[in-house]
Amino acid sequence: MSFDLPDIILRPASLLYKNIIRIRNRLYDQQIFHTWHSPLPIVSIGNISAGGTGKTPLVDWIVKYYLSLGCKPAIVSRGYGRNTKGVQLVSDGKTVLMKSNACGDETAMLAWNNRDAIVIVAEKRKDAVTFIIRRFAEAMPDVIILDDAFQHRQIARNLDIVVINEKEPYFRADMIPKGRLREPLINLARADLLVLSKITGGSTTAAISMDLEQTGKPVIKAGIAAGNLVCLSGMFNTAKESPVHAGIKALAFAGIGSPQSFIDTLEGQGIQIVSHRFFRDHESYTAKKIAALRLEADEKKLTLVTTEKDYFRMLGQPELQEILHTLSCCYLKIRPEFTEGEKLLKTMLNAVINR
């Protein structure tokens, strides 16, 4: 008799993890574990699966929306992949104070793209919020945005948004570590709003939408819209930003949660992917890896194209500074494009600050 050893190991581990999460949530539901209420309004954007849902572009969109209203938002993130500990001030709303190696690639990207927003990283979101209250006592932010905090129940929130990737068949997925689910799907009942991301508009969109509507929660639909292609001849040189020109032959590389979505977006813009290299989400690059990418691109006469998140990750790695001075590379800017429910989302975001 033969056994699938990985399945034998992973399935019980997933069951154990599921039970731990169930007990933890029950303790919060019964108020045995206490939830702290911030004096500042809180918006949480999270997911129920591990990475690749399109959460970060939505966080960026929400920050920009609040800024467009004349509000002062603060972003609180764990800062995945950083080499620091504790509460760290990434941006005071005027100056970005950290590189990505100290605050995480996604956090650095959010800080640089939203210079007027306060940005904090901390393992414990409550510590970050209390730091904001003390540090900015004379000029409090109008709203705090918790990045990736659906499972972080220590803080109460005024609006709880969960992002779900249409391309991932999560209704048939297993719990971590066998699968990618962070907690059972029944816990979507805690959310106030569901965002179905990376939609294609086909039968898959319709099927998942029907499943989500069974939760009784409002569902917003959003695809990924490609912005400009930002190209640098030498990663520290002035960037040249321009619309994507179809026909570019590329070597695409990325270390993100859902790399195939990146490839699909590039191909949707008419970029021809001749070769690609995928790395783990938040994986640090090495000079050897970058040199290999450049060599292959040069030999095949291809353009190196990556994600904006990977671009910021590379810029924050001290050991890459020498090779980046001469590396020609492009990154694609993206944003969510709402096909249904944008007005509802804005109404709910407005309600948070007008309470």
Swiss-Prot record:
List keywords of the entry alphabetically: ATP-binding, Kinase, Lipid A biosynthesis, Lipid biosynthesis, Lipid metabolism, Nucleotide-binding, Transferase
* Pfam families for this protein: LpxK (PF02606)
Q: In which pathway does it act?
A: Glycolipid biosynthesis; lipid IV(A) biosynthesis; lipid IV(A) from (3R)-3-hydroxytetradecanoyl-[acyl-carrier-protein] and UDP-N-acetyl-alpha-D-glucosamine: step 6/6
The protein's matches in InterPro entries, at most eight in alphabetical order, are given as: LpxK, P-loop_NTPase
Q: Which GO terms describe its cellular component?
A: plasma membrane
Reaction(s) this enzyme catalyzes, per UniProt: a lipid A disaccharide + ATP = a lipid IVA + ADP + H(+)
Q: Which residues bind ATP?
A: 49-56
Q: Name one GO biological process term.
A: lipid A biosynthetic process
Q: Name one GO molecular function term.
A: tetraacyldisaccharide 4'-kinase activity
Source domain of life: Bacteria
Q: What is its EC number?
A: 2.7.1.130
User: What does the function comment of this entry state?
Assistant: Transfers the gamma-phosphate of ATP to the 4'-position of a tetraacyldisaccharide 1-phosphate intermediate (termed DS-1-P) to form tetraacyldisaccharide 1,4'-bis-phosphate (lipid IVA).
For this chain, the family text in UniProt reads: Belongs to the LpxK family.
What is the designated name of this protein? Tetraacyldisaccharide 4'-kinase
